[in-house]
Amino acid sequence: MYDNALHIRHLGKQDYESVWHAMQHYTDNRDENSQDEIWIVEHTPVFTQGQAGKSEHILNPGDIPVIQVDRGGQVTYHGPGQLVVYPLLDIKRLKIGVRQLVTHIEQSIINMLKRYQIEAYAKADAPGVYVEERKIASLGLRIRKGCSFHGLALNVDMDMSPFQRINPCGYAGMEMIQCKQLGGPQTVEEAGRQLIETLSQELGLDKLVHHQGLPESYE
C-alpha cells in the first residue's frame, strides 16, 4: 500500500544502463499502491543522448560510451563527482503537472545552493539551473503512465573536461560550472543530503524513508 512517504534509495556508484533499466522496470510496473521514490546515484563516465538529441552535438566522445536514452532533452555527461537524482513519482497522485515538477526540481536546487550563498537561477527556455550564465545542473525527464523517471544531474566535484567533447544540452559553447568552484557542497554525499531536504520540502512530502541499493527485484 502507498504510505504517503518519500522513499530515498542511496545507490552509491553504479553504471548508467543498469540503473536506467531498473527505473524503466519500476515505472512500467507501478500501480496506485506503488511508493514514490527518489534514487540518488553517482555514475561511471557516460554520455547520454536524449530523444531530441542530434548526433552533431557529440563532438569527440573518445573512450566514453554514448547511450541513446528515452528521456527528454539533448546530450549530457555523467561521471564521478556528479550527483544524479532520479525522482520516480506518481505526479497524477501528487496532483502536479510536468511543468510544475520541473519547476519544483529547479527550485529545490536553487534553494539548496542558496544555503551556501550561491545565487542560482532557472531559465524559462532552457531547463536546468545556472550560476552567472554557466550551467551547474542539467535536467531531463520522462513521464509514462502519469509517473516520472530520469531526473537531474548536479556538478559537485568532478573532472569537467568530458563536457568539452559535446555541446552540453545541445548548446555549442555552453559553459559548465560545479559546486566546488563556488564554495558549495564539496562531496556528492553532502550535496545529496542537502538536496533531498529541499526537494522533499518543494514536493510537500516530509515523511522520508531511507534505503540502501536498488529494489531487490531489479538488482
Curated annotation (Swiss-Prot):
<keyword id="KW-0963">Cytoplasm</keyword>
<dbReference type="InterPro" id="IPR004143">
    <property type="entry name" value="BPL_LPL_catalytic"/>
</dbReference>
<dbReference type="GO" id="GO:0033819">
    <property type="term" value="F:lipoyl(octanoyl) transferase activity"/>
</dbReference>
<feature type="binding site">
    <location>
        <begin position="151"/>
        <end position="153"/>
    </location>
    <ligand>
        <name>substrate</name>
    </ligand>
</feature>
<comment type="function">
    <text>Catalyzes the transfer of endogenously produced octanoic acid from octanoyl-acyl-carrier-protein onto the lipoyl domains of lipoate-dependent enzymes. Lipoyl-ACP can also act as a substrate although octanoyl-ACP is likely to be the physiological substrate.</text>
</comment>
<keyword id="KW-0012">Acyltransferase</keyword>
<feature type="active site" description="Acyl-thioester intermediate">
    <location>
        <position position="169"/>
    </location>
</feature>
<dbReference type="InterPro" id="IPR020605">
    <property type="entry name" value="Octanoyltransferase_CS"/>
</dbReference>
<dbReference type="GO" id="GO:0036211">
    <property type="term" value="P:protein modification process"/>
</dbReference>
<feature type="domain" description="BPL/LPL catalytic">
    <location>
        <begin position="32"/>
        <end position="207"/>
    </location>
</feature>
<keyword id="KW-0808">Transferase</keyword>
<protein>
    <recommendedName>
        <fullName>Octanoyltransferase</fullName>
        <ecNumber>2.3.1.181</ecNumber>
    </recommendedName>
</protein>
<dbReference type="InterPro" id="IPR000544">
    <property type="entry name" value="Octanoyltransferase"/>
</dbReference>
<feature type="binding site">
    <location>
        <begin position="71"/>
        <end position="78"/>
    </location>
    <ligand>
        <name>substrate</name>
    </ligand>
</feature>
<comment type="pathway">
    <text>Protein modification; protein lipoylation via endogenous pathway; protein N(6)-(lipoyl)lysine from octanoyl-[acyl-carrier-protein]: step 1/2.</text>
</comment>
<comment type="similarity">
    <text>Belongs to the LipB family.</text>
</comment>
<dbReference type="InterPro" id="IPR045864">
    <property type="entry name" value="aa-tRNA-synth_II/BPL/LPL"/>
</dbReference>
<feature type="site" description="Lowers pKa of active site Cys">
    <location>
        <position position="135"/>
    </location>
</feature>
<dbReference type="Pfam" id="PF21948">
    <property type="entry name" value="LplA-B_cat"/>
</dbReference>
<feature type="binding site">
    <location>
        <begin position="138"/>
        <end position="140"/>
    </location>
    <ligand>
        <name>substrate</name>
    </ligand>
</feature>
<dbReference type="GO" id="GO:0005737">
    <property type="term" value="C:cytoplasm"/>
</dbReference>
